[in-house]
Regions:
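Double-stranded DNA-binding cores of transcription factors and transposases
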Residues: 3, 21-25, 34
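Ser/Thr- (and often Asn-) enriched beta-sheet segments in non-cytosolic proteins
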Residues: 4-6, 203
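Acyl-donor binding region in acyl/amide transferases
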Residues: 6-15, 31-36, 42-43, 49-180
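Short, cationic low-complexity segments
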Residues: 190-205
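Short, charged low-complexity linker/loop segments at the C-terminal edge of domains
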Residues: 179-192
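Hotspots on structured nucleic-acid-binding interfaces, especially in canonical RNA/DNA-binding domains
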Residues: 13-23, 28
């Protein structure tokens, strides 16, 4: 069944967005880097939010999936969008999968318009419990790549701050290519921080 859903781009400061974001299982500590946010409408009702942001700097299983290495990392990561937030407050069969597929197509177009880079793929990180196992991503044909280790190092402008190590919960990692797309090889960011690396980016080692 197809539902009458649509996505409306909004600012992160949007009241409705923030209201729903406050109920997401991951605490709202703000967002860094490139990002796009959307309200999810079912008919005329706002039923959720979904967001995309800059890719995490270093994730072993993700890097293997997208063939990312230390030589191409800074440029290649610009072609990956992280599905940072997805909260749906309407429980209908297959609704989440329909929205996820719609978001992939929409954010790829909007990302190019805003940042000037063609999106080649997506990543997401899920803190698993008895209810969260990535079912919507599996239904949308994302690939389960592995788990993070539960340990991160803080990066600033691509340099690991070895004195700073943060403990985090382990996360399931799902990724998806856009068919026929390749990661950028010569992208120069139009954003206002150094190319490809966002201050404060985390790596999941």
């Amino acid at each position: 069944m197809k539902y009458a859903v649509r996505l409306e781009q909004c600012k992160r400061s949007n009241y409705a967005y923030q209201e729903i974001r406050s109920r997401h299982y991951i605490p709202n500590h703000g967002a860094i880097g490139q990002q796009l946010h959307y309200l999810i409408y079912l008919d005329k009702e706002i039923v959720g939010i979904i967001s995309g942001g800059s890719a995490a700097y270093a994730v072993a299983c993700r890097d293997s999936f997208f063939h990312i290495n230390k030589d191409n990392r800074q440029i290649a990561l610009n072609g990956i969008v992280d599905n940072t937030v997805f909260r749906l407050e309407k429980n209908l069969p297959n609704l989440g999968t329909q929205i996820l597929a719609m978001w992939r197509r929409r954010v790829a177009d909007d990302w190019f318009l805003k940042y000037g880079v063609q999106v080649a793929g997506f990543e997401t990180f899920i803190i698993e419990n008895e209810h969260r196992k990535g079912a919507m991503y599996k239904a949308d044909n994302w690939t389960f790549c592995g788990e993070t280790s539960g340990s991160t190092k803080l990066h600033e402008h691509g340099v690991i701050k070895s004195s700073v190590r943060l403990r985090t919960e382990k996360k399931l990692v799902f990724c998806k290519w856009i068919k026929g797309r390749k990661l950028p090889e010569d992208y120069v960011s139009s954003w206002n921080l150094p190319r490809g690396v966002i201050k404060g980016q985390l790596s999941f080692l």
